[in-house]
Amino acid sequence: MDAVVSCQSNSFQPTDQELAEPSIHPSIDDLIALVRAQEDRIFSHARERAIDPLTLRTQLLLHLPRLVTADDFPDERDIQREILAVSDFLEERRLKYQPEYTQSLKQPERPLSLGDLEFGPLDENTAKMYHESFHYVGSYRPGRHFAFRDKNSGRIVCLGSVASFDLGHAEEKIAPDVDPRSVLMLSRFFAFRWAPENTFSHFHRKLRLQLIEEFDTKLMFSFINPNLGFNASSHKGAHWTLFAREAGTRYMYLDGRYRTMRFFVKNYGTSDAAKLKKKLGRSFEVSTIDLHPMWLLAIPLQRRARKAIPTIPYLFQRPELCASSSAKIFLDC
């Protein structure tokens, strides 16, 4: 799920570049439309493999950009091959986490309401299963984890994790008004399709109270990836604000599998594509299709943090990262 009702002029309006005339070259928006046009086929295949349909769709949107050339999209055969490859990976996760995986996909016996939900902490092992199996990034993010459970069955309805604030470029902007030590990142939010309406807003209210009470948190950030078709509607409903756009988005792959910047820095010491290509050779690939900037959203949890929110969103350039960097960094996409 993704999600600013704000009296400021700060909004989610597209940039001049995003409003430009369509390019003759394949665009990410065209790729999103292509995947949506095949949604019935994708969802049907997911049901046959007993994997989550939405996870398969978003994983395809992460993997297909590596097959886009300067002139054209992947052909029908390539798309089908990618559907099978991503499905194989997701099926591995299903088998790894049985029976919890299959049980999580089952519709509840009766529709749930917000009153059926109970907020509380989630242990690391359980969070890892949901991060790896159902969140579009597909990898575990360490931190503090919280969930809504059905009071009657104990089933997890949604979860979200918070991690330490590690955005050096954003810290420079907020430091005059907010102590960076009082800032957290909201990461890996996920809700099942059968979750009640407005689950994110309800979850955020509970999480906000928890973080203020436990950590005296004053400001929270979260990233949204519009290249997956996310429009931040849930965040808008929960009063998040567009703090910045981060240009330079690109996807990196190892042996055909999408991997995060965090993965490459942890395992190979850098996120610099040229250095990784030299180290890893043909097994390493980078998407060439132009991707929209990532959206960095923010929400003040206490009144004093409102001054840190810009009237006009900042524009950042995505940094190259290395393991020895002493600067705070963002490694999650």
Where are these regions (language model features)?
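Short glycine-/small-residue motifs
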Residues: 159
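Short, cationic low-complexity segments
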Residues: 310-333
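Short amphipathic alpha-helix that is part of the acyltransferase structural core
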Residues: 100-141
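Intrinsically disordered, low-structural-confidence terminal and linker regions
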Residues: 2-8, 12-16, 20-52, 56-57
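Short hydrophobic/aromatic beta-strand or adjacent loop that forms the aromatic wall/cage
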Residues: 143-145, 292-297
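Acyl-donor binding region in acyl/amide transferases
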Residues: 121, 142, 150-151, 163-285, ...
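Glycine-rich acetyl-CoA-binding "A-motif" of GNAT/NAT acetyltransferases
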Residues: 156
